[in-house]
């Protein structure tokens, strides 16, 4: 087989790239290790898409049900600090949109199924070549020749392992607890909440209203691993949910199973090796504090496609090293900045030091009074500042 772009991983990022390239007359083939089996259950996993991510998906004909957010309120549960972000302050109708992961994944998979090899995987790359084509050996024994091999296969990327590129990894020593909650006394379903305290980082995001189910929220609650040594996540939620209900002045009913996963980040020092490119979680991951992981991945995919399409339209080789390097340069700095920023906020808002608590309360209140600073943060988080 011979194809201009081989995409390892049929997730959201890989499928998006395939659709974008197809619209611009560049053929691609997705190699996906799982079977073609759409998950028709709603699930509890959600994604928070910023305005830029939504516009990228809509340009490819992806328009799924979402819960818009036009206000985000963040407060310090150990003091009086708070900050309010409003879409009106940056002349936008919304700050972000929450979608169901399965809805988006199923829609993309359906659109790309004819360009996907399911139940297969790239086992090795026999020849890395940025001048001609690279040769990949698949799990079924077939070989594949491609000008570019795009690793979009997630944070445990097999393609990343094959490249041998250096990688930095950090364990936060935290666990994220996530579940769906019904907010009983809620008068505005367009508001997201975030609270920081010694009981963890608590985020409450509205969910799409399906089958007349209203006032449903997805909760992501990050706590220190040490807390769960003698108590289960379910018991911890049962014993401590009232603390955040009191802080946010709401009542929450747990409406789903309670899941949990360990938190860590990683970042590759380089995103390319000859004609092999790492994109999205294959190249980097961050703390879910701000829900920016998927947005960074789609921003990667956007710039990757932009550079490849520009080269193709100019009659240049799409795997020219200078072109692929432009993608790396444009995205690596932004991703690293977001990763380091999240690490700072996690440490800052997890601290139990009294002086740090006083400082962050002062900081939140000061930024809340400074419109241009708030506007800068909001425009950046919304993906409106493109580099």
Model regions and ranges:
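Beta1/beta-strand and adjacent pyrophosphate-binding region of the FAD-binding site
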Residues: 1-11
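FAD/FMN-dependent oxidoreductases across multiple families
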Residues: 227-312, 319
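C-terminal helical "tail/cap" subdomain of flavin- and related membrane-associated enzymes
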Residues: 306-387
């Amino acid at each position: 087989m011979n194809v201009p772009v081989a995409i390892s991983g049929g997730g959201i990022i890989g499928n998006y790239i395939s659709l974008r390239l197809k619209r611009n007359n560049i053929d691609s083939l997705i190699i996906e290790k799982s079977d073609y089996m759409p998950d028709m259950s709603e699930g509890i996993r959600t994604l928070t898409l910023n305005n830029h991510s939504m516009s990228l998906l809509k340009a490819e004909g992806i328009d799924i049900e979402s819960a818009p957010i036009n206000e985000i309120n963040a407060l310090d549960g150990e003091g009086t600090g708070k900050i309010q972000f409003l879409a009106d302050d940056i002349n936008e109708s919304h700050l972000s949109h929450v979608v169901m992961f399965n809805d988006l994944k199923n829609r993309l998979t359906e659109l790309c199924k004819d360009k996907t090899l399911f139940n297969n995987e790239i086992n090795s790359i026999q020849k890395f070549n940025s001048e001609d084509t690279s040769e990949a050996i698949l799990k079924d024994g077939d070989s594949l020749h491609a000008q570019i091999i795009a690793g979009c296969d997630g944070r445990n990327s097999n393609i990343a392992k094959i490249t041998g590129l250096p990688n930095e990894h950090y364990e936060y020593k935290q666990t994220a607890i996530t579940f769906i909650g019904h907010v009983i006394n809620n008068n505005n379903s367009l508001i997201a909440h975030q609270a920081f305290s010694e009981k963890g980082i608590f985020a409450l995001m509205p969910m799409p209203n399906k089958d007349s189910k209203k006032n449903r929220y997805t909760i992501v609650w990050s706590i220190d691993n040490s807390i769960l040594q003698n108590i289960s996540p379910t018991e911890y939620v049962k014993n401590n949910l009232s603390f955040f209900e009191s802080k946010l002045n709401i009542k929450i009913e747990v409406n789903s199973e309670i899941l949990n996963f360990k938190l860590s980040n990683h970042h590759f020092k380089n995103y390319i090796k000859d004609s092999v490119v790492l994109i999205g979680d294959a190249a980097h991951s961050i703390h879910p504090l701000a829900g920016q992981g998927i947005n960074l991945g789609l921003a990667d995919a956007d710039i990757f496609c932009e550079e490849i399409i520009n080269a193709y339209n100019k009659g240049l080789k799409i795997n020219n090293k200078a072109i692929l390097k432009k993608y790396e340069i444009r995205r690596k700095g932004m991703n690293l900045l977001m990763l380091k920023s999240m690490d700072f906020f996690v440490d800052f808002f997890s601290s139990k030091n009294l002086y740090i608590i006083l400082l962050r309360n002062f900081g939140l209140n000061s930024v809340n009074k400074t419109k241009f600073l708030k506007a800068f943060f909001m425009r950046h988080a919304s993906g409106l500042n493109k580099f």
